[in-house]
């Protein structure tokens, strides 16, 4: 895999976006928003890696839903979303299933977000992929009120 660029146009983790998620009055998890830290949008199928860590603990992929354009997807669906476009000025919501949610206070969120730049073919690359990868990773401490 070839890494070409990291262009931090915006913070990946959106300020003041952390909240617990309630379903039928029960706290079933939490959510926060992320943005592409890049000047172009991407199709969701171009996401090579989306990993979330909260307070130093990795969130299992099966517990994460990715929400964009009024739709909600599992991490396993992302490689097949060839027609779902993520505009660079839109925030996506990450929903995490965690019965009881998070406690109020500060929580450190680390997002690993690597995207394949489908328009940046790397000739001669014999590794897994022949496309440059955009590093849109980010981390931030948010306060849950």
Regions found by a protein language model. Give the residues of each.
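Terminal leader/tail segments of proteins
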Residues: 1-145
